[in-house]
Amino acid sequence: MSSEDAKKLKNPVPFTKKSIAQGRTTFQRFCTGCHGADGKAQVDVVADATDLTSPNLYKSGTSDGEIFRSVRDGAGETMPPFQTQITNETDLWHLVNFIHSLWPESMRPPLKDQ
């Protein structure tokens, strides 16, 4: 998927506490080894792992679709693709929502269930 196509993707899963919790489960299973439990990156494991709490450091874009593409297809030289491990697209979208929840509050989308 091209970066332009990724930018056009819209997350069909609302940004809710339930979605964030479901995304957290996927994150804990597949992502903490490189990004750490807090999302701040395990640079002692992967030197160029992205600190997911700082969107300004993202190299492959910060839109929902760009994050989705980075997880599904991989990004850069060290972020592997997870399309064969996370095969359900809804689970990927929940993960995108969880990643957004790691951002500073002023940068997060508004919760839909408040």
Q: Which sequence ranges carry the predicted segments?
A:
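Electrostatic cytochrome c docking/interface patches
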Residues: 1-26, 114
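Gly/Gly-Pro-rich "capping" loops immediately C-terminal to redox-active cysteine motifs
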Residues: 24, 36, 40-69
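Conserved functional loop/turn residues at catalytic and ligand-binding sites
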Residues: 30, 38, 56, 74-75, ...
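Sequence context surrounding c-type heme c attachment/ligation sites in exported
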Residues: 21-28, 61-65, 86-87, 104, ...
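Low-complexity, Gly/Pro
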Residues: 16, 40, 87-88
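Second-shell loop/turn segments in exported
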Residues: 12-13, 56-57, 81
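The canonical Cys-X-X-Cys-His
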Residues: 23-37, 79, 95-99
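Axial heme c-ligation environment in periplasmic c-type cytochrome domains
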Residues: 46-51, 70-103, 107-114
